[in-house]
Amino acid sequence: MRPLSRSISRLAAVAMGDRKADLIIQNCSLVSVYTGEVIEGTEIAVSGDRIAYVGPDASHARGAGTVIHNAQGRYAAPGFADPHIHVDQFVTPAELAAQSVLHGTTSLFSDPIDMVGVAGYRGFRTLMNMSKDLPARFFHVVPGGLPVDGRFSHSNTLSPEEERSAIGLPDVLGMGEVFSWTKVTSRDPGTMRSIGTMLDGGCIINGHTAGASGKKLSAYVSAGILSCHEPVNAEQAEERLRLGMWVMMREGSIRRDLAEILPPMLKKEAGLDRLMFCTDGIDPVDMGEKGHIDHCVREAVRLGADPVRAIAMASRNCFDYYNMARDLGGISPGRIADIQMLYDLESFRPEDVFVGGNRMVSGGKLVSRQHPVKAPSWTRRTIRLGRLTAADFAVHSRKKTEQVNTITMKTEIITEQGSAELSVKEGNVEPSRDSDVWKVAAFDRLSGNGGRTVGFLENFGADIGALASSWSFHENDLVVLGSSEIEMAKAANAVMDKGGGIAVVQKGRVSAMLPLQICGIISSDPFGKVSEGLSKLTSVMTDAGCTFQRPHLVPVFLPFLALPSVRILYSGMVDVRRRSYIPVIAGARTASQRPKTLRNIKKGPKSVR
């Protein structure tokens, strides 16, 4: 995106008719996010990637080489933006961009936490390169949540020097969600240093304030963190707005909070200019069925929002927050020509989409040619483990029965500590399918040290042998759960054979497999194939009686230290609130909790770490 300063003379000349436009959009109904009105009979003249003229008649800017687009009364609205999305999930940026722009979402603000968690600064730069020259534009933030808790976390992160380098790169706007607000309230030196670096660089810092209120929330905001996507109701949203924050109303694949937040805010007419929509991540199935930010706009209107107000929340408000209003967010002279032509203000379905004045979508179909940067070969070699066997999932005991501590799943995401009495056979504590007690294991797949912990999990409910995933927030351990050690090994090995992914094993065979070959978190397959793979993965487990609607999220969230109550990493089972390890065998010592080491370590590229 070229600075406006390089275009001002040309734009002024086109606006005056002294130079001819590259594109004129005629006969459109302009959705003005600045005045809240729809202006019929508008014409828009575009020069290069920016708008030069908006008004009733652009004929003075028409030349022999000007492309004329007759909108036939369609609504011209600014491209939508997703101000907080983790794009390092499921599909490549190229596949995501192609789908997003079909839904009128032309800007994505990427927080690549897992890519950095796997591969550090190299991963950050790689994802940036993969996001260039695509139908939608990408902006980036430096992950602000790694490590979530240095006492237990082993995730990669950026060094202070790398943070400073990153914010000097084009399209890097600042820092992503700062997960652990307790690190701010306790003035953790590393966290405060990183925040200071961002503030000194004039950067945006995004927030994550789940569970914070009162003086704790004030302390967090006082550090210059001015947005949050974690409010789940209007009361939480209002508390943050009153402290000067911006609120991103989340409507994505993991949580949908819009219906709880927006109606009371509309009734009060409070803080509407500081509300945005975000997904926080969206999977291919949801994208295909619901859409992207266009879905949020439809929902907002259904909940009572004026259509133009909803469009402003999806566009102008986002760029106001990111201090980019001079360039993006609305249709006016000087701004980038990210324009979508909507059939109506009910479906918000775009017929045509222009990004930087170039037509990316025509007649509802993608017409831009893509030449995406491919993931480098090292991204397919991030699993540094050898073949696993049933013995690698053993929990040893000399007794006939053992009392064990368990992770009880309340939802796909929420856990609590439980306990169970299990039988011991040939020195191995066994899971109990009858009692819905599973084994769960986390393996270090990145460093090559072979560390792992094996524990127990309750309330998964599916009649399967095992589920394995190389993608997990934000440690990216290889997480395996199952009712059979043999099938757990088979599922884990199936994932490793693909270079990463999610696998289900039933009755000794792999019944569903979603390859995630790029760093073990992103698929190199086309969007449609990934969507089909995720759908099959889900249906196989729900048809087998799984308790949850999105079973793949169970291993994804099991190591996630930003949420209570009990988590498992390769270093051990963790009580998040008490910040202490939990013994797998009740009453056993956890003093050092040194991770057990496998002998069959597969050597990989040192540069991954």
Swiss-Prot record:
GO biological process per UniProt: adenine catabolic process
InterPro entries: Adenine_deam, Adenine_deam_C, Amidohydro-rel, Metal-dep_hydrolase_composite, Metal_Hydrolase
Keyword Manganese: yes
Enzyme class: hydrolase
Pfam families: Adenine_deam_C, Amidohydro_1
Swiss-Prot/TrEMBL catalytic activity: adenine + H2O + H(+) = hypoxanthine + NH4(+)
Keyword entries, A-Z: Hydrolase, Manganese
Superkingdom of origin organism: Archaea
GO molecular function: adenine deaminase activity
Keyword check for Manganese: yes
Cofactor(s) needed: Mn(2+)
E.C. numbers: 3.5.4.2
Family statement: Belongs to the metallo-dependent hydrolases superfamily. Adenine deaminase family.
Protein name in the entry: Adenine deaminase
Originating species: Cenarchaeum symbiosum (strain A)
